[in-house]
Curated annotation (Swiss-Prot):
SUPFAM superfamilies: Thioredoxin-like (SSF52833). This is Epididymal secretory glutathione peroxidase. Belongs to the glutathione peroxidase family. One of its GO terms (molecular function) is glutathione peroxidase activity. One of its GO terms (cellular component) is extracellular region. It catalyses: 2 glutathione + H2O2 = glutathione disulfide + 2 H2O. Keywords: Oxidoreductase, Peroxidase, Secreted, Signal. Gene3D superfamilies: Glutaredoxin (3.40.30.10). The active site is at C73. Pfam families: GSHPx. One of its GO terms (biological process) is response to oxidative stress. It comes from Macaca fascicularis (Crab-eating macaque). It is found in: Secreted.
């Protein structure tokens, strides 16, 4: 299949994501509960293309941004912005972690070995390479959701009361704190406790502003 045909084949996926990014009046950010038990250090995930578990306890003392990502989505344009965010805030201890998922519009259809080539040659394309850790593709909602996302979602209420349409929900069971779409974000503090959560409609620049405001408290310590 030629590159042109591949792009045509992927157009429905991209258009579906643009529908999800239409602006609406809704809250973009929500603070997490402060009384949840446990930390993200109790969990781990398999690094993309390395077949090895990465225990999140290796990030003790870091501020971690968890992002569920997809290659063939209008929001995939956030990848370069996340690279820039990682680079700019790395001196302040920020670590970005990406988790490919195919549950939203089937916009991560390939297997694990196809994800990095898709990013490099198709979208964002132009030789793009993420400078932050990606993990193997997996579910973030439903019966087979990754345990770390069960913890994050339980710790942080969703910014929006709108769960979505029945057509957009492909998982079971459905819970009120479920992730709605690609590129939602959770910030975890240096103690491993979730701090805040953003809707997929929040721009990376607004997320950056919120993180910088949050980091100010650590400059005085």
């Amino acid at each position: 299949m030629t590159t042109q045909l591949r792009v045509v084949h992927l157009l429905p996926l991209l258009l579906a994501c643009f529908v999800q990014t239409s602006p609406k009046q809704e809250t973009m950010k929500m603070d997490c509960h402060k009384d949840e038990k446990g930390t993200i250090y109790d969990y781990e995930a398999i690094a993309l293309n390395k077949n090895e578990y990465v225990p999140f306890k290796q990030y003790v003392g870091k501020h971690i941004l968890f992002v569920n990502v997809a290659t063939y989505c209008g929001l995939t344009a956030q990848y370069p912005e996340l690279n820039a965010l990682q680079e700019e805030l790395k001196p302040y201890g920020l670590v970005v972690l990406g988790f490919p998922c195919n549950q939203f519009g089937k916009q991560e259809p390939g297997d694990n070995k196809e994800i990095l080539p898709g990013l490099k040659y198709v979208r964002p394309g132009g030789g793009f390479v993420p400078n932050f850790q990606l993990f193997e593709k997996g579910d973030v909602n439903g019966e087979k959701e990754q345990k770390v996302f069960s913890f994050l979602k339980h710790s942080c209420p969703h910014p929006s009361e709108i769960l979505g349409t029945f057509k957009s929900i492909s998982w079971d069971p459905v819970k009120v704190h479920d992730i709605r779409w690609n590129f939602e974000k959770f910030l975890v503090g240096p103690d491993g406790i979730p701090v805040m959560r953003w809707s997929h409609r929040a721009t990376v620049s607004s997320v950056k502003t919120d993180i910088l405001a949050y980091l100010k408290q650590f400059k005085t310590k």
